[in-house]
């Protein structure tokens, strides 16, 4: 038997991402965002959803670009801390000893400790209610060499210990149990 619950956003898990924004060092900020995802494959597009009252909101709106920095188990404390502290009061890079790096295609910094940094340029902002959705083109992706398979060049997801968010908690991803299309693959 299933129970009826009030409507809610129960789509979990989600990436526990650190989104970076700002066009100069004085305005650089990090915001923890779980409302982040893929919108389109071709052209590659992502979104983040941010409350308008957040410190990063006007910075995002002014510069119209950001970097989605995926996080790891080792970054869990910093990920949570950056979500409960305001950039008005703290330099989050300094406080969490995270290293701002130069992105290739946007002015916003990336986080050097992140295994995967997705550089985005905003196309549209959609006011939805509690959050506004920043719809963006992916203009570059930086992947840490230590997580790339030396033979295939593919990103080794399992070895990166990516962090995810689910219903108020942080979790690391588990083991791979299949791959896309494995259910219809012909047996050899």
Named regions from a protein language model:
Residues 1-188:
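Basic, polyanion-binding surface patches
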């Amino acid at each position: 038997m299933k129970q009826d619950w009030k409507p809610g956003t129960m789509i979990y898990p989600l990436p526990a991402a650190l989104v970076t924004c700002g066009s100069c060092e004085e305005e650089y900020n990090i915001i923890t965002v779980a409302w982040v995802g893929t919108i389109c494959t071709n052209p590659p597009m992502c979104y983040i959803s941010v409350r308008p009252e957040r410190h990063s909101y006007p910075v995002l709106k002014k510069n119209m670009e950001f970097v989605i920095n995926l996080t790891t188990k080792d970054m869990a404390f910093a990920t949570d801390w950056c979500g409960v502290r305001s950039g008005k009061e703290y330099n989050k890079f300094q406080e969490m000893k995270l290293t701002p790096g130069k992105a290739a295609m946007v002015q916003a910094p990336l986080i050097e400790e992140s295994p995967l940094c997705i550089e985005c340029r905003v196309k549209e902002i959609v006011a939805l209610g509690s959050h506004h959705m920043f719809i963006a083109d992916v203009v570059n992706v930086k992947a840490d060499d230590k997580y790339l398979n030396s033979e295939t060049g593919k990103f080794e997801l399992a070895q990166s210990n990516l962090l995810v968010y689910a219903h108020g908690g942080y979790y690391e991803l588990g083991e791979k149990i299949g791959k896309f299309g494995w259910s219809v693959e012909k047996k050899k």
